[in-house]
Design a protein with these regions (language model features):
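Hydrophobic alpha-helical membrane segments
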Residues: 24-214
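Sec-dependent N-terminal signal peptides
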Residues: 3-13
Length: 214
């Protein structure tokens, strides 16, 4: 019975309409099988988040749509790193950081506009994106802290610490499958910290003039 329910569920993912935005990526002829396999769990998540106000995302586009676009445009490996960066930034501190850099808001729901591709590349700070990325390669989270976002850096460290500890504990208990799963999650967030440090230093800086993030 459980197998039948799973089959029906995944069939529904394939034939559903555009209520769930990532479904369009699943049906897109430009997305390969690996990208679609990675986007599939995001599409499943949207069936929960889009039907519960408690799971509403503060960003526009939402983290699930952002992740789906990242995977579709950059492939599953880089796309997952980009998604991990967004997940780390989607914290209680996001609104204050958004105000600091004169970020724009999406109306009428006033979500924080944070596009995948940022067109305004003007950087008024003296922070080096490459140096920030290098710091996070050595100590995850430190690159974001260097770039001026201490709490984002702390959140990144925390995510890696949690998943890394879970992986280590699983291997200690000879739970290989669980250990491998958490190892992959740790690697994804580690990659996300490197990308996130670079992106933070390059784009998410407090402006010295009236320029906005587009």
């Amino acid at each position: 019975m459980r197998s039948i329910l799973l089959i029906v569920f995944f069939m529904n993912l394939g034939i559903s309409q555009d209520k769930y935005p990532t479904d369009t990526l699943l049906r897109s002829p430009t997305s390969n099988i690996f990208e679609k396999a990675t986007i599939l769990p995001i599409s499943a998540w949207q069936r929960l988040s889009y039907n519960s106000n408690l799971l509403s995302c503060q960003f526009y586009p939402s983290c699930s749509n952002y992740g789906g676009l990242a995977i579709s445009e950059h492939g599953p490996f880089i796309g997952l790193a980009i998604t991990a960066d967004r997940i780390v930034r989607c914290s209680p501190f996001a609104l204050e950081y958004h105000y600091d850099m004169n970020g724009k808001f999406h109306y009428p729901d006033y979500r924080l506009i944070d596009p995948l591709q940022i067109t305004n590349t003007k950087n008024n700070s003296n922070k080096s994106p490459l140096f920030a990325a290098g710091l996070s390669m050595i100590l995850p989270g430190s690159g974001r802290i260097y770039a001026g976002r201490f709490m984002d850096g702390f959140m990144g460290m925390w995510m890696i610490a949690i998943s890394g500890t879970a992986a280590y504990s699983s291997f200690q208990e000879n739970k290989t499958i669980k250990g491998n799963l958490f190892s992959v999650i740790t690697l994804i967030f580690y990659s996300g910290e490197i990308y996130g440090a670079y992106r933070t230093a390059k784009y998410y800086q407090i402006p010295n003039d009236n320029s906005d993030l587009n």
